[in-house]
Amino acid sequence: MPTILSSKPAFNSLFSYHLIGLISNKLVTLAPDYTGTKKTTWGARLHLQELRVQTKHRQIEPDIKNLPLQPIRYGSFRPVFHWIEKPCMLIGLCGLHSEVSFIANWPWGKPSEIGGCSIPCMLTGRGSELSYHIRASRRPLPGNRFHFQSFF
C-alpha cells in the first residue's frame, strides 16, 4: 500500500498542503471583513481602512497616513493587516507556533512582523485588496517575496 503522506516537509509536498488544509479548515479564523462578518473560509479580501484587528488584550488600528504606496505587477496595492490562528502550523513552515500572530505585508515585498510568530508569513495581493492563502511555494519572486497560491 502506498503511503498517503509524503516524507518530504510540508512546504515541498503539494498533497501535504491539501491535507493540512482539509484538516485545519476549522482552525482558520480571519479578522472581520469590511461588512463586519466573520470569515472562516480559505481566503478573504479585507479593506485596510475599515479593518480593526481585535486581540484578547488590545485593539490594533493600522496607521496608513505615512505608508508609501507603490504599484506592483498586479496594479496599485495597499498593505493590509489581518490575522489567522496558528499560521505556521497551517502552512507548515515551523509547526511550533500556537499563539495568534499579526502579520503585515508591504507592497514592495518586505514583510513586517507585528507580533507572535518568529517566521513572518509572506502574502501576495491583487489590485487594491489582498487575497491571503494557506499554501505557499518556496520559489522566490522579485523583491524577496514568496508566491502564495490559492486552494480555489
Curated annotation (Swiss-Prot):
Keyword Mitochondrion appears in the UniProt entry: yes
Keyword annotations: Mitochondrion
GO cellular component, one term: mitochondrion
Origin superkingdom: Eukaryota
Subcellular location: Mitochondrion
Any further remark recorded for this protein: A stretch of 270 kb of the mitochondrial genome is duplicated within the centromere of chromosome 2 resulting in the duplication of the gene. The expression of this duplicated gene (At2g07702) is demonstrated.
Stated name of the protein: Uncharacterized mitochondrial protein AtMg00440/AtMg01140
Species whose genome carries this gene: Arabidopsis thaliana (Mouse-ear cress)
Lineage: Eukaryota, Viridiplantae, Streptophyta, Embryophyta, Tracheophyta
